[in-house]
Amino acid sequence: MRLSPLTGVVLLIKVLFLCAFNLVHHHEREKPMGRVDGKVAIVSGAALGIGKAAALLLAQEGASVIVGDINKEEGQKTVSEIEGKGGKAFFLLLDVRKEEDWKSVIEGALSRFGRLDIMVNNAGIAYSGSVESTTLEDWRRVQSINLDGVFLGTKYAIEGIRQHGAGGSIINLSSIEGLIGDPELAAYNASKGGVRIFTKSSALHCAKAGYKIRVNSVHPGYIWTPMVAGLTQEDEAARKRLVDLHPIGHLGEPDDIAYGILYLASDESKFVTGSELVIDGGYTAQ
């Protein structure tokens, strides 16, 4: 069917209008929406990777952020990036295995910002080894960081959040390896599986106590972070094998997880507690 010149012009105008609308709408989506405006967050392991991405995004969306890490140099860089974009943040040294560090960080949040609303227990390490090859020393090291750190962070965050009485959100980073087993990840599986079920216990405790504190776990697939890069040791073939594990066809990026954390931190998830947010490119759907 041949269109008249007038009809063609009208269609062209409509197409141009839709393109302009979509472009404006895209830019609007990129603008901060204040989803956690006025809230105060602590992010452990916020110097690099997922923790850094979460700290940056929470700050962008209006939260004041305590950057906790053992890596002071990189942690200060995270703070500088946040402040450079007009956000509020400061760094506190945090070894998640140490109870005294946790007490200091919670007190630091309360003294600096007067409250605590959000805790992101992100710090963790990877370790590869079967049940036979893993030493007791390595087993305990993995549990002390990945599981003890989440226990301490949750325990003291509850105490800190309760002080203002308005409730809050605790987000614990588990993994797809907390949902499924891997013969070469005995200690890591145990630690991340522990985070998963500990999160549910904590969520029930807070709900039944009437604290208005939600507790949820996030389960990333393989995300291209320094930790995962270290596992592949810059081996392109190893990276391709990781990519092939994900039906979506690529590895995740730190921001993919940060947006999930933001949702759980915000009031948009006010009916979500004791849940598992799996962000894995289809890995566990197979």
Predicted regions and their residues:
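Short, small/polar-rich loop/turn modules that mediate ligand/substrate recognition or access, typified
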Residues: 212-214, 272-274
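Substrate-binding pocket helix/loop in short-chain dehydrogenase/reductase
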Residues: 130-131, 135-143, 238, 242
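Active-site helix of classical SDR
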Residues: 154, 191, 199
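Short C-terminal tail/terminal secondary-structure segment
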Residues: 14-15, 180, 248, 261-262, ...
